[in-house]
Amino acid sequence: MAFGEPPSGHSTRHRTLHGLSFHTAMGMAWSLHYQGQGGTLCLVGVSTPSHDKAVLQGLPHFSVNLGVQPSALAGRRGDASCPSSWRSADPTVSPNLGAPGGPNAIDALHGEQLGLFLRTKMGRDPKDVHGLTPALCGPCLAGLPSSHSPQFSCNTAPLKMLS
């Protein structure tokens, strides 16, 4: 799958987030993985036809994993919201992925401070977040590619939409 190519067979809407171009599938959840300069960026989004909200269910924190540690992320705490049994045994996927307090992950508050996603006037409640939002990423979410996969892929993710 080429960079920027939407999931096949789905109606999509183009999105750009801080220079990263991708598509959202209307009415379903899917994941995106991009290996670029500075590390690995993983996103999971849910798009609803009514308000095109990006909302996630069952994830208490939105997190971004950059694979390597930029100086701006030093000392940031992340969130481990997925069962360890779901995580990949391949150490090359992303070091410290989802590790509590790991240097490669940031939580929702720090994500806002660093401009990784927008804060709505209602706060960080995922029900009130509009637009695609970075979320907890890693092999614990089905569909994310391994280190042997292409640079970009987006796949349906096992997440339920909030009505």
Curated annotation (Swiss-Prot):
UniProt-recorded name of the protein: Putative uncharacterized protein FLJ45177
Organism: Homo sapiens (Human)
